[in-house]
Amino acid sequence: MVKKNSKKAAPATIARNKRATFEYRFEEKMEAGISLMGWEVKSIRMGKVNLSDCYVFLKNGEAFMHGCTIIPLNTASTHVVCDPIRLKKLLLSRKELDKLAGLVERQGYSIIPISMYWRKGAWVKVEIGLGKGKKDHDKREDTKAREWEVEKARVMKKEKTRG
């Protein structure tokens, strides 16, 4: 039996921070590993994670994710005290950390987690974005553009069914 050429599967998304794309304009995105405990991995496999109020900060040359809520399972761990909002260390190279530190300190950028996903089936990765907060008028422009795209698609569909 001949094996078919299998394309690399897209990473399975665990959670997305939808609010981040509305609140921030990202100029650069990068992938970071995350240091987790066993009960956290089990909870993530069950989909009990929330990134909505999450952000990344740098301290002593290391990156930490704050505000990521992982709800512990009742059966996950009986001998460890589970803290759902503990700090999670992000695993980045020294070069990446130095770059982030320079941009955050000098140019006022924010580091925000965008999504969490599985890499190669076993590794949890976090996509972080380096961006600046949007002003209110920027948010309104984005909303208008989104509504225009929906309206345009509706008109095109209507014209297609007529003709």
Swiss-Prot record:
The keyword Lipoprotein does not apply. Keywords: Cytoplasm, RNA-binding. GO terms for molecular function: RNA binding. Its main location: cytoplasm. It is found in: Cytoplasm. Signal peptide: none annotated. GO terms for cellular component: cytosol. HAMAP family: SmpB. PANTHER family: SSRA-BINDING PROTEIN, TMRNA-BINDING COMPONENT OF TRANS-TRANSLATION TAGGING COMPLEX. Required for rescue of stalled ribosomes mediated by trans-translation. Binds to transfer-messenger RNA (tmRNA), required for stable association of tmRNA with ribosomes. tmRNA and SmpB together mimic tRNA shape, replacing the anticodon stem-loop with SmpB. tmRNA is encoded by the ssrA gene; the 2 termini fold to resemble tRNA(Ala) and it encodes a 'tag peptide', a short internal open reading frame. During trans-translation Ala-aminoacylated tmRNA acts like a tRNA, entering the A-site of stalled ribosomes, displacing the stalled mRNA. This is SsrA-binding protein.
